[in-house]
């Protein structure tokens, strides 16, 4: 009669046949057999992320195959290995192939860390941007699935992975989740995360300091490169030239490339045809604005992470009023929580609604009014905002004006650009993104923007 260990080995072989190789190698092989008692099969996952993923995506398959193999119903419990570290010497039943694989992985990681200076590949990843905090909806299902596939098996199916979509829809979140995932699986992985602006600045510094070889080594030695906002490479001929060769070097070496943009490659103006071709050779995954159910799920998940309980009607109220993007939605949530905390009022629709929509309805304003009020609050003139001046006060006022026109009017990006002396629509888009990024970290700017909104009675949800 086969032992439990032999039966588990048989289960593993059947799982290997039923699952794709990347899925088996990434999720099943690292899991260790811990115990089998009273019809319960206990497995140990290497970390909490793997444990959650196994439980959510593979527990049913494991239960079905194990039940068939053991000859009776089997329930699977998946635990985190670290939780059992104190008694693993007494209870844990390991297999030599798994143990050897763990040792080999550890040794390889040590070799990698010795060969490559750590500081070269320390990605500035946001700790919040991980897969288990990303809410998947119809708007993002394909992009999420592609990101997971790339994270599990980099350099194979979708290379490059090109994620595109509007501002604040989760492109950066998905991209950085891939980086976190790879580092979770392989701490020695060389992950490079940069914005296109950083890549360009690094290139300029390298040219000035005669450091092109070091620059090329830094980017071309990466196992995984994540480049955010690649649309800003438009019109930068030398940057495009260098990125073309970097792309080729990485792709030919089988390294994974992930790019994000606010539009598909073919719609990026002044982008070299050869780059359009290369950016399109993998998979282009689009993210759309989330629907009502997804927006509600996003708010619910955020509330859970903040350890707060929000009434369902309040969640539905906020989700129904902030429809453009996730960043705007989460901003409304933060304001509602802060308002309730400061005032001591309960978190209800009645108490929060006036703060989120003080006028009761979105007020349409004219571009001229925006210019007037921004000039008044920021201490510049309307003429200066329409001029090419790059003085910081003027530049900041101009960006805020573009941001508020987008939120308070129905003007398209090109029409907003016309209101500021014929600025290009990409300049307007960049200005909007910059203001949105700064609002959470620069209280003075946030106060000035709110003051203009109050003067104009702009409903913050008035954005098409």
Curated annotation (Swiss-Prot):
InterPro entries: AAA+_ATPase (IPR003593), Chromosome_initiator_DnaA (IPR001957), Chromosome_initiator_DnaA-like (IPR020591), Chromosome_initiator_DnaA_CS (IPR018312), DnaA_C (IPR013159), DnaA_dom (IPR013317), DnaA_N_dom (IPR024633), DnaA_N_sf (IPR038454). Its main location: cytoplasm. GO terms for biological process: DNA replication initiation; regulation of DNA replication. GO terms for molecular function: ATP binding; ATP hydrolysis activity; DNA replication origin binding; lipid binding. ATP binds at residues 168, 170-172. The keyword Nucleotide-binding applies. Residues 1-84 are annotated as: Domain I, interacts with DnaA modulators. Residues 341-464 are annotated as: Domain IV, binds dsDNA. CDD domains: AAA (cd00009), Bac_DnaA_C (cd06571). Keywords: ATP-binding, Cytoplasm, DNA replication, DNA-binding, Lipid-binding, Nucleotide-binding. It holds the Pfam family Bac_DnaA. Residues 124-340 are annotated as: Domain III, AAA+ region. It comes from the Bacteria. PROSITE patterns: DNAA (PS01008). GO terms for cellular component: cytoplasm; plasma membrane. Coiled coil: none annotated. Belongs to the DnaA family. Domain I is involved in oligomerization and binding regulators, domain II is flexibile and of varying length in different bacteria, domain III forms the AAA+ region, while domain IV binds dsDNA. Plays an essential role in the initiation and regulation of chromosomal replication. ATP-DnaA binds to the origin of replication (oriC) to initiate formation of the DNA replication initiation complex once per cell cycle. Binds the DnaA box (a 9 base pair repeat at the origin) and separates the double-stranded (ds)DNA. Forms a right-handed helical filament on oriC DNA; dsDNA binds to the exterior of the filament while single-stranded (ss)DNA is stabiized in the filament's interior. HAMAP family: DnaA_bact (MF_00377). This is Chromosomal replication initiator protein DnaA. It comes from Prochlorococcus marinus (strain NATL1A).
